A protein has these predicted regions:
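Terminal domain-initiation and capping elements
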Residues: 1-197
Length: 197
């Protein structure tokens, strides 16, 4: 899941930069230009892990990464085999243990938590209340994001929402959309608690 979503994210990034949809300034990641995320959720924690995985992938070559690793108190582990094949990485048990420790520590940093709260938490509320959503998860995540951000008073008009979808056959797709002014007429009538009874 994580590897396929990252590949799809890289393809989205390449297209977004090539077409001028997003223009990166010095020290920026494409994740800085996505206001909210709604992703495929086999379960809620997978969304949290997916965000951590994407942020690590995007931030590790930026100046902010040294501040992240300083807060964690360790450098990001590196696999022994420089080829970086999935087989060599999975076979490197010392790396896998260290990487899991690093991921957990990263998810406790202020950098991750600030981004998570700002860009993803609201899209996971429905999953927390309903449970596993599988096929409908990305769209239920969007509904959750819209409803809970609306209740917080967030104006989503003009905001970019990044979508990450994963399907059978180990394939993934990443795309984005911009919230239009008419969303308010739809979202003001949403009541997830009432709808799920």
């Amino acid at each position: 899941y994580l590897i396929q979503v990252r590949k799809a994210f890289d393809a989205y990034k390449e297209k977004a930069l090539k077409t001028g949809l997003v223009k990166l300034n010095e020290g920026e990641a494409i994740t800085d230009h996505i206001d909210f995320f709604s992703v495929h959720l086999p379960y809620r924690r997978m969304g949290e892990k997916a965000l951590a995985y994407l942020l690590r992938h995007e931030w590790r070559h930026l100046p902010r990464w040294k501040h992240v690793t300083k807060e964690i108190g360790m450098n990001e582990p590196q696999p022994k085999d420089p080829r970086g094949t999935i087989e060599s990485i999975l076979a490197d048990t010392d790396f896998m243990k260290a990487d899991e420790q690093f991921r957990r520590a990263f998810m406790q940093t202020s950098f991750y938590n600030e981004t998570y709260e700002k860009k993803m938490a609201s899209s996971l509320e429905a999953s927390a209340q309903i449970g596993n959503l599988y096929t409908a998860s990305m769209y239920m995540g969007l509904r959750s994001l819209l409803e809970f951000e609306f209740k917080k008073g967030t104006d989503l008009e003009g905001k970019r929402i990044g979508f990450g979808s994963y399907g059978s056959g180990s394939s993934a797709m990443v795309f984005s959309g911009i919230m239009q002014p008419t969303y308010k007429y739809i979202v003001k009538g949403m009541d997830l608690q009432n709808d799920i009874g």
